[in-house]
Amino acid sequence: SVVKSEDFSLPAYMDRRDHPLPEVAHVKHLSASQKALKEKEKASWSSLSMDEKVELYRIKFKESFAEMNRGSNEWKTVVGGAMFFIGFTALVIMWQKHYVYGPLPQSFDKEWVAKQTKRMLDMKVNPIQGLASKWDYEKNEWKK
């Protein structure tokens, strides 16, 4: 069996808001009832019912402007996927904190930082512009 490929040199149908009138009709191969309706279209349009007018519109166009402008639900999939990956990342981080990383070193403890600061003040580290310059040694408190 031979498969006939699409001829891409011919115009193709597309519903686009920026190009509202496509060069070809939506339905390429008309059925017998659609052919009869196209013949009836050549007469007065006042003799056509509303359903026949809609059917003629659907032969030419796949979607109306309202249908083209209707929002899609794709954002729900994107938000759901993003939330899945954020949740997975949070689980990996919690696993790492529990099983991979050890306890924090003692130098992160507030008491240790206070002792280290006191030691630096006692040694008068950087007395011109640094930490020791902001400490009042006579009153034993930070300068105001």
Curated annotation (Swiss-Prot):
UniProt topological domain (Mitochondrial matrix) ranges: 1-73
One GO-annotated biological process of the protein: mitochondrial electron transport, cytochrome c to oxygen
Xref: Pfam families: COX4
InterPro entries in alphabetical order: Cyt_c_oxidase_su4, Cyt_c_oxidase_su4_fam, Cyt_c_oxidase_su4_sf
Domain of life (superkingdom): Eukaryota
Mitochondrial intermembrane-side positions: 100-144
Positions of post-translational Phosphoserine modification: 31, 33
The keyword Phosphoprotein is assigned to this record: yes
Record-level GO cellular component terms: mitochondrial inner membrane; respiratory chain complex IV
Keywords: Acetylation, Membrane, Mitochondrion, Mitochondrion inner membrane, Phosphoprotein, Transmembrane, Transmembrane helix
Keyword Transmembrane helix listed: yes
Residue spans crossing the bilayer: 74-99
Subcellular location: Mitochondrion inner membrane
Modified-residue entries (N6-acetyllysine), positions: 4, 28, 35, 42
Topology in the lipid bilayer: Single-pass membrane protein
Sequence positions bearing N6-succinyllysine: 4, 35
Quaternary data: Component of the cytochrome c oxidase (complex IV, CIV), a multisubunit enzyme composed of 14 subunits. The complex is composed of a catalytic core of 3 subunits MT-CO1, MT-CO2 and MT-CO3, encoded in the mitochondrial DNA, and 11 supernumerary subunits COX4I, COX5A, COX5B, COX6A, COX6B, COX6C, COX7A, COX7B, COX7C, COX8 and NDUFA4, which are encoded in the nuclear genome.
Function: Component of the cytochrome c oxidase, the last enzyme in the mitochondrial electron transport chain which drives oxidative phosphorylation. The respiratory chain contains 3 multisubunit complexes succinate dehydrogenase (complex II, CII), ubiquinol-cytochrome c oxidoreductase (cytochrome b-c1 complex, complex III, CIII) and cytochrome c oxidase (complex IV, CIV), that cooperate to transfer electrons derived from NADH and succinate to molecular oxygen, creating an electrochemical gradient over the inner membrane that drives transmembrane transport and the ATP synthase.
UniProt family annotation: Belongs to the cytochrome c oxidase IV family.
Name under which the protein is recorded: Cytochrome c oxidase subunit 4 isoform 1, mitochondrial
Gene from which this protein is expressed: COX4I1
